[in-house]
Amino acid sequence: MRVSKYLLSTQKETPANAEVISHQLMLRAGMIRRNASGLYSYLPTGLRVLRKVEAIVREEMNKAGAIEILMPMVQPADLWVETGRWDKFGPELLRFKDRHNRDFVLGPTHEEVITDLIRKEVSSYKQLPLNLYQIQTKFRDEVRPRFGMMRSREFLMKDAYSFHLDVDTMNETYEAMYTAYSNILSRMGLAFRPVLADTGSIGGSMSHEFHVLAQSGEDLIAYSTGSDYAANIEKAESPMPTEPRGAATEALRLVDTPNAKTIAELVEQFGLDITKTVKTLIVKGATEAAPLVALIVRGDHELNEVKADKLDLVASPLEMAPEALIRDAIGAGPGSLGPVGLNMPIIIDHSVSVMSDFAAGANVDDKHYFGINWERDLPLAQAADIRNVVEGEPTPDGLGTYAMARGIEVGHIFQLGTNYSKSMNATVLDENGKSQVLLMGCYGVGVSRIVAAAIEQNFDDRGIVWPEAIAPFSVGILPMNMHKSHRVTDIAEQLYKDLSAAGIEVLLDDRKERPGVMFADMELIGIPHTVVIGDRNIDAGVFEYKNRRTGEKQDIPFDQLVDFLKNAVKS
């Protein structure tokens, strides 16, 4: 491709409204342009990268035995009514009526459509298992689209759905998808981690997320320093205490604490060890008999809201009780709450169950109890894992300790079970002629999100540093002053033909432009390999080669360059 016949559209200045580096660089590199909030057009450079990501995803899905189909973006509302998600989904589900006053949605996902398709097309166990996938545009009407392609309203996604009669084949397909996703991200040259994940509102028995590691990632990943164990912070298991509860050495005493509204203030003012304090949070309960529930974690720990949401006594979704309701029930406000004398169900974290001589609010404003001990001052409460893990703690497999990294979720695989097939009556006849509800798996990859995540992991102060497999072009040719030198023009044109004939994707900058601008554009759009041609190089019989990632420069003889670049691109 010649730049003179290409829509390069680079920008020197960073757009003011672009918050994250991927959004900034996709705009500056001429990859995308905004049409409306959360809606973007792909320009040629962006589309080339998107198509390369899409091709790798498609190849690995096909290799794993999945079959490609294509479902409509517009979906009839009656399918969503059938599963109950018409009412459960919030305003992010874009609903509209056609000219006949029939309800439709712009699909944010395709569970309903695929289940409807399978219940009509599959009737016998002999047709199973099946794993069908598509690469299709999705739409979610986000209240505040942010971060460019990282959280846009319209996006490209690969979603696959598998159907089974038995758990064994569902597990086999799940493992195949796990491997396929790992292969996809490995082929793209991205550092990533598969992590155990919460199944969330979708439910199901097993779930993994695939995260591209990046300091800008919204998700916190807890992983083992000694094994492959990794989990989303919401799912990571806290270790059980190994030390027994210490004996009581202090008397229970009521202390005035007028200026200690937080644990940090309490610790600072009274010289306490933060591990000898607890935080009490009041949430709404799941029953009329217990409308409020107290959740208690150690002062240096944080409540894990996803874990808390799964407690039987706690209302789901988890909702913190408002201060007015707390005061009405307890007589004190947040900052002065604790377990002693508290007349409601109490659930403590396992780490709290082994505490002794600890401090907590006294359920009277501006007062705390010091020297609290279980089974002396109050009964030992129900204990559960309700906190976030902490770096340095042992991991559940016993093979290492927790370390933390930030990640961007680009893939998610679920075992759905019968969540959708049961509500939509998707059944087949088994080998005994008996009707059986289908088991389902669901496997999603954010194709357009991978593009943004790759940039978040691969950039420097000059622009994008693409991994080889998804770069828009492999080689950039920079002829210096080619419009003034026939020698430079002739050699640049010949090199362009030779590299193209070798199957290498080349961008030849044939503009009448200053060398500084040409270099800046090549580095901004992230082409992995650049070749500079000038009269001085020609006199020496060499090309000047530069590697975008390492910055390494070297002179390569004319007759060796094509083979050198073939090897560089392959590696």
Swiss-Prot record:
Q: What class of enzyme is it?
A: ligase
Output the Gene3D superfamilies linked to this UniProt entry: Anticodon-binding domain, Bira Bifunctional Protein, Domain 2, YbaK/aminoacyl-tRNA synthetase-associated domain
Spell out the PROSITE patterns in the cross-references.
AA_TRNA_LIGASE_II
InterPro entries per record: aa-tRNA-synt_IIb (IPR002314), aa-tRNA-synth_II (IPR006195), aa-tRNA-synth_II/BPL/LPL (IPR045864), Anticodon-bd (IPR004154), Anticodon-bd_dom_sf (IPR036621), Pro-tRNA-ligase_IIa (IPR002316), Pro-tRNA-synth_IIa_bac-type (IPR004500), Pro-tRNA-Synthase_IIa_type1 (IPR023717)
- BP GO terms, sorted: prolyl-tRNA aminoacylation
What are the protein's GO molecular function terms?
Answer: aminoacyl-tRNA deacylase activity; ATP binding; proline-tRNA ligase activity
Enzyme Commission (EC) number: 6.1.1.15
Is ATP-binding included in the keywords of this UniProt record?
yes
* Name of one Pfam family that matches: HGTP_anticodon
**What is the protein's quaternary organization?**
Homodimer.
Indicate what this protein is called per its UniProt record: Proline--tRNA ligase
> What organism does this protein naturally occur in?
Shewanella putrefaciens (strain CN-32 / ATCC BAA-453)
Mind giving the lineage of the organism this protein is from? Bacteria, Pseudomonadati, Pseudomonadota, Gammaproteobacteria, Alteromonadales
